C-alpha cells in the first residue's frame, strides 16, 4: 500500500557531521578581536612610555620637594633663588671720626695717625663737618697672668730647709730602729740586774690607757699580800714562777708600766684587736709607747710621753693622774701618811723628726730616772734633733748588746727574801 506522501516531496538524507573536525570561526569576529588586543597593547605602551618620560624628566629635579613624596629627608640640592633688584639707598653723610691710636711702644712714644676723611659721593651734598673731639688717651695694657704668676712665690731658702728636714728624718730613722714589746721587756730585765728595786713587768699584753690604773692597783694589792704572807690574788706572769714573782714583789720599790696607745680604738678590746692587726702586718702604724713610773719609795707618779701631748694635753693628764694618786693613797698608804705626787716629765716634743723611736725614748728616760730620780735629764738634751738621736742611738746599741744573751720572755731570778 502506497504512502500518502508524494515521492517528489522527499528530501535527500543529510550526511552526519564528523565531531572530530573543529568548527571554523568566521573572519569578521576574528578581526574585531585582533583590533581590541592591538588597541589595548598600544594603550599600555603609551602609558609606559609616558611614565618613563615623566621619570626621566623628574630625575633632574628634586622629587622630594613635592608634598606627596614619601621621603622625610630634606633635600640637599640648592633651590633656585629669584633675585629682585632693589634700588640702592643714597649713601649716608660721612662724619670723620678719630681713629684709635696703636698701643704705645716702650722705646719711643708713637704718634697717633691723623684721621682719614671719608669721601662722599659727588651727587650728594655734604653736611657741615663737626669739630673733631680730641683723641682719648690710650688705655694701659692689662697684665697677662701666667701659671707661674698664679702660684705663690716660695723663697729658695724654704726649699733648702725642706730638703734638710727630709735628710734629717732619713738619718734619724736609720739611727734608731723601732722597739717592740720583746726588746722593751729584755731592756727591763737588764735594768733589774743594775737596780734590784725595779720589777720587770711584762709588756705583752701591754697596759693601755684603758686598764693601766687597774694593773697598778692589782700589783700593789699583791705586794701588800706578799708582805703579809698571804697568797696573791692577781694573775701570775706567763714566764715567771710564783715563788720568783713573790720575791720580786717583796723587794720592788719601782713599777715601770709601759702603755701601748693607738688613737683609733676607743675601748680596751678594740685596742687589743688593733694591736694584733698591726702585729700581723708588721707595721707600727700610729701606735705609740708611753711610760708611767710608780715610785713607791718616793711616793711619785711620773708620766713620760716623748710626743708630749699625743694622748691628751699635759694639763688634762696631770688632772687625771692627780685623781689616780688619791686613789693610790687609799690602796697603798704610807707609814708616815705621805701622799703620792704627780710629775709630767716631758715639757716639749722629745722625738722630733722620728716616728718610731718612742719605745727607745721610754727606756732611755727610765734609765735616767734610775740613775738619779731627782735630776731632770731632759733639760740637758741637745737642741739639734740629729744630735739628740745620735745620743739615743748610742744608748740603743748598748742595750741591744747587753740583752743579746738574755732568754726570750724569761724573768730574772730575784734575790731571796731572807
UniProtKB/Swiss-Prot annotation:
InterPro entries named in the record: Papain-like_cys_pep_sf, Peptidase_C48_C
A Pfam cross-reference name: Peptidase_C48
Main location: secreted
Enzyme Commission number(s) from the entry: 3.4.22.-
Record annotation: effect of changing residue 358 to A: Loss of activity
Compartments in which it is found: Secreted; Host cell; Membrane
Region Disordered, residue ranges: 1-23, 72-143
Topology of the protein relative to the lipid bilayer: Single-pass membrane protein
Polar residues bias locations: 1-10
UniProt keyword annotation of Transmembrane helix present: yes
Biased segments, Pro residues type: 86-141
GO MF entry, a single one: cysteine-type deubiquitinase activity
Keyword annotations of the record: Hydrolase, Membrane, Protease, Secreted, Thiol protease, Transmembrane, Transmembrane helix, Ubl conjugation pathway, Virulence
SUPFAM superfamilies in UniProt: Cysteine proteinases
Catalytic residue positions: 288, 305, 358
GO cellular component: extracellular region; host cell; membrane
Family to which the UniProt record says this protein belongs: Belongs to the peptidase C48 family.
Free-text function comment from the UniProt entry: Effector proteins function to alter host cell physiology and promote bacterial survival in host tissues. This protease possesses deubiquitinating and deneddylating activities.
Descriptive protein name: Deubiquitinase and deneddylase Dub1
Amino acid at each position: 500500500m502506497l504512502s500518502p506522501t508524494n515521492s517528489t516531496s522527499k528530501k535527500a538524507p543529510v550526511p552526519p557531521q564528523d565531531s572530530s573536525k573543529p568548527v571554523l570561526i568566521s573572519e569578521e569576529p576574528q578581526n574585531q578581536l585582533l583590533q581590541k588586543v592591538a588597541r589595548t597593547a598600544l594603550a599600555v605602551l603609551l602609558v609606559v612610555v609616558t611614565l618613563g618620560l615623566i621619570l626621566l624628566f623628574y630625575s633632574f629635579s628634586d622629587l622630594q620637594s613635592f608634598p606627596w613624596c614619601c621621603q622625610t629627608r630634606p633635600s640637599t640640592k640648592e633651590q633656585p633663588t629669584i633675585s629682585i633688584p632693589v634700588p640702592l639707598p643714597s649713601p649716608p653723610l660721612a662724619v670723620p671720626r678719630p681713629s684709635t691710636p696703636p698701643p704705645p711702644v716702650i722705646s719711643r712714644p708713637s704718634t697717633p695717625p691723623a684721621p682719614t676723611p671719608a669721601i662722599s659721593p659727588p651727587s650728594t651734598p655734604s653736611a657741615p663737618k663737626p669739630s673733631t673731639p680730641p683723641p682719648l688717651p690710650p688705655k694701659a695694657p692689662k697684665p697677662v697672668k701666667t701659671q707661674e704668676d698664679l702660684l705663690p712665690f716660695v723663697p729658695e731658702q724654704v726649699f733648702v730647709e725642706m730638703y734638710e728636714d727630709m735628710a734629717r728624718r732619713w738619718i734619724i730613722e736609720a739611727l734608731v730602729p723601732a722597739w717592740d714589746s720583746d726588746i722593751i721587756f729584755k731592756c727591763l730585765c737588764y735594768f733589774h740586774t743594775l737596780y734590784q728595786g725595779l720589777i720587770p713587768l711584762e709588756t705583752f699584753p701591754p697596759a693601755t690607757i684603758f686598764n693601766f690604773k687597774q694593773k697598778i692597783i692589782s700589783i700593789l694589792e699583791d705586794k701588800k699580800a706578799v708582805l703579809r704572807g698571804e697568797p696573791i690574788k692577781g694573775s701570775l706572769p706567763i714566764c715567771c714562777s710564783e715563788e720568783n714573782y713573790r720575791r720580786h714583789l717583796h723587794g720592788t720599790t719601782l713599777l715601770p708600766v709601759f702603755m701601748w696607745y693607738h688613737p683609733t680604738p676607743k675601748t680596751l678590746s678594740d685596742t687589743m684587736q688593733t694591736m694584733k692587726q698591726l702585729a700581723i702586718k708588721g707595721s707600727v702604724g700610729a701606735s705609740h709607747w708611753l711610760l708611767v713610773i710608780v715610785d713607791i719609795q718616793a711616793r711619785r707618779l711620773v708620766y713620760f710621753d716623748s710626743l708630749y701631748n699625743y694622748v691628751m694635753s699635759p694639763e688634762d693628764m696631770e688632772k687625771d693622774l692627780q685623781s689616780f694618786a688619791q686613789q693610790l693613797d687609799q690602796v697603798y698608804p704610807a707609814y708616815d701618811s705621805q701622799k703620792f705626787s704627780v710629775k709630767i716629765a716631758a715639757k716639749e716634743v722629745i722625738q722630733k723628726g722620728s716616728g718610731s723611736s718612742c719605745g727607745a725614748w721610754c727606756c732611755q728616760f727610765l734609765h735616767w730616772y734610775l740613775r738619779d730620780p731627782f735630776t731632770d735629764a731632759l733639760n740637758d738634751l741637745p737642741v739639734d734633733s740629729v744630735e739628740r738621736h745620735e745620743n739615743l742611738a748610742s744608748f740603743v746599741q748598748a742595750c741591744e748588746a747587753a740583752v743579746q744573751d738574755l732568754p726570750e720572755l724569761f724573768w730574772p731570778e730575784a734575790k731571796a727574801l731572807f
